[in-house]
């Protein structure tokens, strides 16, 4: 639980806090809900190249429909976003193709979230909005004015935010929970850092800060930081040798254009199969050791502005560009522009760890806590989970039962056999909602039921202490870097699994092939 809680801090710590700075996420295009596929719908006659499909269907994803209207509206938003970033907008057909691919993946993620019982209510959206506004140092009303000034309705933004929260919680459960970093791996990593003093700065973090983190300030020193963008030419699972060869040829053509000096972000927007394609391929900034080994080998020695050779992974062919990098003197700055008012820059996954290296001991207030977790699912709604925990809390406060016994009986967390004991928790070890609820408790006090990305919790604080955590912080940072190194390929693998297991009828793609054959 502790590893998972720590690794998932990015939901509200980065993704949500940066959404205003990045402008409206493209998932706002989903503001028009999909209509259920009509029963008995028969495949329409093939339209002439200049005609629209008579049924208005752009794609079918399992049992869901993506309409042409959704694609058009999403394309308008994507075009506006690319223009804000200073990226050349692809031609209309290419843009719609890229947008539809994104909508298909978002629909698959939404279906998976529904299957796992992940839901986001209005109160959670309000909480996220308040947090975004607070971190951008504006009021929710001012934030709303900024959003609407950009041409996006408040209802669209709220829906987009709800979708992003839900999708992030899904990724946390489906991807992050399967990334396990052992103590032996941490030991080996730290030994390697000792042999490489420059890289070792990545694990020397400042003391964890109490609740509200502030926007990142330029550091005076730090580890090697790398800002990467990519173009991905995906190789579908089960592709034949001829298909792989054709995709390699396509990737080599894109690489040649990038090496020749064509704008990388524009190439990515028009051609990349990666989830960040419509952000110009931007993957964000991380310490060098936080990137996958393949990426480090290909781009670790490149200067800012340089492009790697072709990198082959299990998902296809990657072309990497070093957008920016910094050693110990100055932090890397994300290169894409973002509208006011926030100074932060967006990242596809999360910001890299803080790079400042403290001198001397790191003293923090640790909390010894335990909890009971009930996860939501198709058979356990939010209301049911909350009510069950309220009943347990009443029994605990009445003295009829012991907390550890209730945890062993009801908790769905890995700490259940230990009576829900989390041990000594450092600031920043848990997701912000959990930490905020825990920090509000006095010793021996039990919280009301509270919601985190994992489900509903009861938390009890046992005691607090001041403690020097220099070694623990170093190990925690090492574990985080190792986690981040695996997160990118793990996420791509998960997306590929979702795609390969689904029924996808991409009618725009079929129409394009038909037109090519008729030429």
From Swiss-Prot:
E.C. designation(s): 5.2.1.8
Domain description: The PPIase activity resides only in the second parvulin domain. The N-terminal region and the C-terminal tail are necessary and sufficient for the chaperone activity of SurA. The PPIase activity is dispensable for SurA to function as a chaperone. The N-terminal region and the C-terminal tail are also required for porin recognition.
PANTHER family (alphabetical): CHAPERONE SURA (PTHR47637:SF1)
Localization annotation: Periplasm
PROSITE patterns, per the entry: PPIC_PPIASE_2
Known role: Chaperone involved in the correct folding and assembly of outer membrane proteins. Recognizes specific patterns of aromatic residues and the orientation of their side chains, which are found more frequently in integral outer membrane proteins. May act in both early periplasmic and late outer membrane-associated steps of protein maturation.
Protein name: Chaperone SurA
Leader sequence residues: 1-31
Compositionally biased region (Low complexity): 31-45, 197-207
GO CC term (a single one): outer membrane-bounded periplasmic space
Keyword Transcription attached: no
The PpiC domain, residue ranges: 223-324, 364-463
Pfam families registered for this protein in UniProt: Rotamase, Rotamase_3, SurA_N
InterPro entries assigned to the protein according to its UniProt record, in alphabetical order: OMP_Chaperone_SurA, PPIase_dom_sf, PPIase_PpiC, PPIase_SurA, SurA_N, Trigger_fact/SurA_dom_sf
Enzyme class: isomerase
Predominant place of localization: periplasm
Region (Disordered): 31-50, 196-221, 328-361
